[in-house]
Design a protein with these regions (language model features):
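RNase H-like nuclease fold core
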Residues: 1-47, 58-62, 141, 145-152, ...
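RNase H catalytic domain
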Residues: 8-14, 55-139
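Short, conserved alpha-helix that lines the donor NDP-sugar binding/gating region
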Residues: 49, 53
Length: 158
């Protein structure tokens, strides 16, 4: 299964912020097999993007010694792809401090992902261009923004 993730936030970073994330899992026949949408207040778009990817890692990540390939996960967030594919390893080595001597934002989510990574779990996280017409990325965006519900996504694309 291939996953597409997205996060969204209105009034990003403010006390009145309302955000959400969407996850879409598509099988080899281009049928939606899994959707997830969650929302919360007092958040940021980056936090929601990270949560979507973390959800896939925790629920569908493949342990290195298991049979099979890790699931491919597409995100349109360069921040998230770079965080989980590169930056977190340097931050962990330096005691979770960035080069500017600051603690990374969303450290709780990054450390949760890193802990699973250290246990041998993997996903194949890749960057996709956002809002470029990919129907599954667009569906993840619609779930994240609340434009479409999980039930509507299954009924339309399942």
């Amino acid at each position: 299964m291939i996953f597409y993730t997205d996060g969204s936030c209105l009034a990003n970073g403010s006390i009145n912020a309302k955000g959400g994330y969407g996850v879409v899992g598509v099988d080899d026949e281009e049928k939606v097999q899994f959707v997830r949408a969650r929302s919360e207040t007092g958040t940021t778009n980056n936090r929601q993007e990270l949560k979507a990817i973390l959800y896939v890692m925790l629920n569908f990540g493949v342990k290195c010694d298991d049979w099979g390939q890790p699931p491919i996960v597409y995100s349109d967030s360069a921040y998230c792809v770079n965080t989980f594919n590169e930056w977190m390893f340097n931050w962990a080595r330096k005691g979770w401090i960035k080069s500017d001597k600051k603690i990374p934002e969303n450290l709780d989510l990054i450390q949760a992902y890193y802990d699973w990574y250290k246990e041998g779990y993997r996903i194949d996280l890749r960057k996709i261009k956002g809002h470029a017409g990919d129907q599954w990325n667009e569906l993840a965006d619609q779930l994240a923004t609340g434009y479409i519900s999980e039930e509507e996504a299954y009924a339309t694309y399942g």
